Amino acid sequence: MKCPFCSHPDTQVVETREAEDGGFIRRRRQCGGCDKRFTTYERPEVSFPAIVKKDGRRIEYERAKLLGSFKIALRKRPVSTEQIDAAIERIEERLRNLGEREVLSSRLGEMVMRELKLLDKVGYIRYASVYRSFEDVDDFKNVMDEVRNPG
């Protein structure tokens, strides 16, 4: 691996550690040219199914888009970044476990709603209002009743 400081092509791994959750490997490297040390992270490459939009277009799954949706729904709510990341990890695990090459955007939206309902009811209602295209106050009332009286 090339040194990020001097671009020397020869670096040596001086320490390797696996993350607590086993999701990645942390390596400390030392440059053979300038002797500076730097850290790299190695994680397995994972492919996700393509997302099929309502109009039939197929787009690549983008974690950043999902994160953006969570952040909008949970803006100014008492939900930590760690909680959001954990919710996204659960969704990504479900997507991987589907074993399918494509997934409907509506199915992904339902996964997001399930996670938001567990994290924060207000965030859930905010997301539902856009996702389900609320048109009037009755739509909000119906979802609020659903949140108050699950089952």
UniProtKB/Swiss-Prot annotation:
Cofactor: Zn(2+)
Classification via PROSITE patterns: ATP_CONE
Transmembrane found in the keyword field: no
Zinc finger (unnamed): 3-34
Domain of life: Bacteria
GO terms, biological process: negative regulation of DNA-templated transcription
GO molecular function: ATP binding; DNA binding; zinc ion binding
Entry-linked HAMAP family: NrdR (MF_00440)
Function (record text): Negatively regulates transcription of bacterial ribonucleotide reductase nrd genes and operons by binding to NrdR-boxes.
Protein name per its UniProtKB record: Transcriptional repressor NrdR
Lineage: Bacteria, Pseudomonadati, Pseudomonadota, Betaproteobacteria, Burkholderiales
